[in-house]
């Protein structure tokens, strides 16, 4: 840990976390960020093998080998696995999506629209209510009608998050050309986030000649939607 990070208040001045944990537990330790490791786990023993097994059981011979993993939480994380190998990149930045351009606010990074702070900001803008003390879970509860507040504003906060995430994912998927899986603390609000994600992934972009093309060259299916999955 190089910097003095808010997420690690007990570690200051630079801590060699890998060697520390290895000595502490007596086992090999591999250190990486949550986005990379989420993607790696889903590729080796999670979503990717689940998709391939389901296809196989239904008589489909095609198998997927590449995966984009996205984490929604304090920030906007990502990781890429290509044919079983985690994409590290020459500078350790492989799969980083947080600093892509924000589709709603092009002068901002994507993470300003895909994060805990984004959910709170949009809810406050849409509802006109102070969000002091409100967590994303509280806002989810408002969307569900289980807590006092503005349900439509709460749903819109998650939808906008999905829209910005979906645009960034579309850019990444055009390069990765594989399946995508979403996780992280905010993923529990998936019923309100996924519509924005899917709508963005199914978006189009035009040419000066007046033609419109899908922003993704491949078809988009929501694995959580049974009707989509059967396609």
Label every model-predicted segment.
Residues 19, 23-27, 50, 54-62, ...:
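ATP-binding/phosphotransfer module of carbohydrate and carboxylate kinases, centering on a glycine-rich
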Residues 1, 36-39, 77, 187-190:
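Short, active-site-adjacent cap segments at secondary-structure transitions
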Residues 69-71, 76-81:
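Short beta-strand scaffold segments in enzyme catalytic cores
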